[in-house]
């Protein structure tokens, strides 16, 4: 019973973000489709080879995607919304891009599909759309082509396929309502066809991802697994793959399935290995997800070995990453600016492959010397002064209930704010960022590289802020922003100015499509050595008589969009960040900034996957926000922003944030999200996003007016704000000006009645 290792997937963007650059070049019309496809082939070949060189036995194929893997699955099944279809019914890569972006180099523009978070990660997928009587057929053979590529290169491969029930679970019904689970029998023949094609190619194992099995699924969905997998059995061996949580609550459903193996996440789940071994059929393979695919920390391999060693030799066993390595940066070895001590604490995707090789070798030989050597830096870290700050720990321990309460209730504050700002009905604003032009990015890069001194850099940034203020005044917006020219990323910027964080040069991970983020890493206790945003906010406010919002990223979002420490709770990290940013709110207020936005787009995505675990998380998440904001005076208006969210199940907590104004992303869901606020009778002010900033399409005045009228049927007009869905950082100035001009015009039309 020789143990082998495998990964569930590998980062696809490339070490230098080659995929992003190729996509954006193609979208802009600067390269051909053939050139784009060639970059994909080159990256796949490189990544398979890198994994093999790092000691991986069985390589994942089908984990590559041109936008996201759920969208790839939609195309595989022929699930293309009517508005995105080619006239001749064919499907090509531009079809895929139209679903993701709303437009592509060919075909007519049409509203992009809805985008949402992949379980509780920072990765996104395009939500599959289902209509009554829908037909499915094998349409997009990317998976089969990539398997052929890998086999031609001589690799031992394991195709990766998103399972049918998880796929249906992730989608939404459009038009006439029906139970989307009823489509299961319609999509299974396509899965059967794909598995038959893989069998023809001599494939032994297929990784079929069913992460929905870690959720608290309705009984009807659990019941659907047995007949579905009865239909899929027999052509190849199926490794039923779960991740992000444990499977014990649904183990009875799982063990009844006609599959040949089960992958479990032993990092994020609480499954007991001995219990799993006892309950799984004896002829099943167990794939043990021991190496964290979602973080950057070096694994304590001695501990991982102890976790699994008792079942070695008792059943077929593979060792693996907990989930796809998609969520981790690619290679630590190219990081030249991290000091040796801190660098020794980390492992990126390729190093995690090496960890899997070390673990496999030790489990096969019984020799653990290499594991102890690998794990030594982890022991040293526990006592490092880089990690522990007694002053922060003391301040955290001294928090009282009073620290999370504003001085007065919303009604009292709203009156003070109305008297101070005298805003018109339907006040217009934006979410914070303006287009990050090539000039802005070059300016920041030159400064970072030392090619530009601090004075010239500051002059340049001041000029861009001035331009943003001039543009907004010209457009007639009511509440302005400084545009965030100095910020590369809403989380990275704050991390760079807080103690307790470190940064990488090339630690990119994919968020969606071509968007990549470089998350900060929380290595120790968090504190604020000096004001962060005050100087630029104060400068922007000096340029105009209109209020300029101070812009902060909230504590839960900084936590969720960073790689967190693993030695303290997420609650502890969030509250440390909240205390640091509380001081920033006080300093902004003292500098004359009267409106302060604390963005919490990640509040909902941080929810545990199981509803039974929600309350504890929401309690400390809300408390962290309130600690951050509660220092503000009555006439200081606190805004918050949230995106990609479904709120109906957490409305109590949204209201408990007690922000004076909340702006939300609603345009892609056609104001659907406002139902939650209406039913809950949300007491404070709200700005439902009136156009989708993820698409370059410019909305008409009529379209925006119609959305606002729809919103006013649910929320009293006197409590409505008018704003885009999200920040405008990724857009160009021409479409930004056009869209905002239409938005302001729509608000003015409504004021006139």
UniProtKB/Swiss-Prot annotation:
Reactions mediated catalytically: 5-methyltetrahydropteroyltri-L-glutamate + L-homocysteine = tetrahydropteroyltri-L-glutamate + L-methionine
Keywords in alphabetical order: Amino-acid biosynthesis, Metal-binding, Methionine biosynthesis, Methyltransferase, Repeat, Transferase, Zinc
Instruction: Give coiled-coil spans as residue ranges.
Output: none
Question: What's the Enzyme Commission number for this chain?
Answer: 2.1.1.14
**What does the entry list as the binding residues for L-homocysteine?**
431-433, 484, 599
Q: Which Gene3D superfamilies match?
A: 3.20.20.210
Q: Which cofactor does it need?
A: Zn(2+)
Q: Which residues bind Zn(2+)?
A: 641, 643, 665, 726
Q: Which InterPro entries match?
A: Cbl-indep_Met_Synth_N (IPR013215), Cobalamin-indep_Met_synthase (IPR006276), Met_Synth_C/arc (IPR002629), UROD/MetE-like_sf (IPR038071)
The entry's active site is 694
The entry's protein name is 5-methyltetrahydropteroyltriglutamate--homocysteine methyltransferase
Q: Which organism is it from?
A: Escherichia coli O1:K1 / APEC
